[in-house]
């Protein structure tokens, strides 16, 4: 109830800002209903990655108890799975209320695109790949280690995907995550390839690594990664290197991230150790969107 009240209050403020007075909504013509329903459908398909295999229908549009808004039922069919949800929508289809307040003329992932910095961070895959996956990870995170083979398989099989890795060491619960993140940055400064080999080593040997043996293992690994050992050691103690990791942490905080792994597939969020199929679905959907040119902007 509080959340609904907050949404209604936010809507009232928006209407006021637009110079609109809350008045009783007049019935929409059939043509208006069709246009609004289509706009809502396009936006929801984009928001939830519903491709052509998912049936989406907006029906039963009528005046709601909230002045200036119409109530509509969104029906969703995915094979044998069916569901429906009541939403509120403005007469022009611009504003949609479903727990959160949405402006259907804006990209719901615009804030992510504006916040995430890709340049200067480890990446793997074609530079011109149409799908970019950003992973915020923690080398000590068990769930990240579970995701690791999935991402490795994905990058081996797909040539239309680029992965950008960003640090999100959860220092409150992981005692060597920050040191590992700093080591990763040091390896990256000498060689992007060395970073990815270190990345693989840390996840593949995560259970054997401790706070006490991390430095010893990193030093022993350096020659195998073709790293200049003294430079690698010095870098791991420098505040400037740690500052790079902390900048990534601030970025993650701005995005509201609290757990790892957290993925963004062309800015679309996906949390946790997702299955190969779940990630592939979003990749295929993004490629479909680009082909159709139908993403709302």
Regions found by a protein language model. Give the residues of each.
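Sec/Tat signal peptide C-region and signal peptidase I cleavage site
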Residues: 20-25
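Bacterial N-terminal signal peptides
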Residues: 7-19
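A short, surface-exposed interaction/processing loop segment used at functional sites
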Residues: 91-122
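A short beta-strand-turn-helix
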Residues: 115-131, 155
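Positively charged n-region of N-terminal signal peptides that target proteins for export
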Residues: 1-4
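C-terminal cap of thioredoxin/glutaredoxin-like
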Residues: 26-98, 219-297
């Amino acid at each position: 109830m509080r959340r609904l009240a907050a949404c209604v209050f936010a809507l009232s403020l928006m209407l006021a800002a637009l110079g609109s007075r809350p008045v009783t909504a007049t019935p929409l013509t059939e043509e208006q209903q069709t246009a609004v329903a289509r706009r809502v459908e396009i936006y929801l398909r984009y928001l939830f990655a519903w491709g052509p295999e998912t049936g989406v229908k907006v029906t039963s549009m009528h005046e709601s108890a909230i002045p200036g808004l119409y109530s509509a039922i969104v029906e969703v069919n995915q094979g044998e799975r069916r569901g429906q949800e009541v939403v509120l929508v403005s007469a022009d289809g611009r504003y949609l209320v479903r727990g959160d307040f949405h402006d259907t003329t804006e990209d719901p992932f615009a804030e992510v695109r504006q916040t995430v910095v890709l340049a200067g961070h480890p990446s793997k895959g074609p530079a011109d790949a149409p799908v970019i996956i950003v992973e915020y990870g923690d080398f000590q995170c068990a769930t990240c280690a579970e995701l690791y083979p999935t991402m490795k398989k994905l990058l081996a099989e797909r040539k239309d995907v680029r992965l950008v890795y960003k640090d999100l060491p959860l220092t409150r619960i992981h005692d060597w995550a920050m040191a590992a993140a700093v080591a990763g940055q040091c390896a990256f400064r000498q060689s992007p390839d060395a970073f990815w080999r270190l990345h693989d080593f840390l996840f593949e040997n995560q259970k054997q690594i401790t706070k006490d043996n991390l430095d010893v293992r990193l030093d022993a690994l350096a020659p195998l990664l073709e790293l200049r050992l003294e430079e690698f050691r010095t870098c791991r103690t420098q505040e400037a290197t740690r500052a790079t990791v902390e900048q990534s942490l601030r970025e993650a905080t701005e995005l509201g991230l609290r757990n790892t792994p957290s993925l963004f597939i062309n800015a679309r969020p996906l949390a946790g150790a997702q299955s190969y199929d779940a990630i592939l679905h979003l990749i295929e959907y993004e490629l479909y969107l680009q082909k159709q040119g139908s993403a709302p902007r």
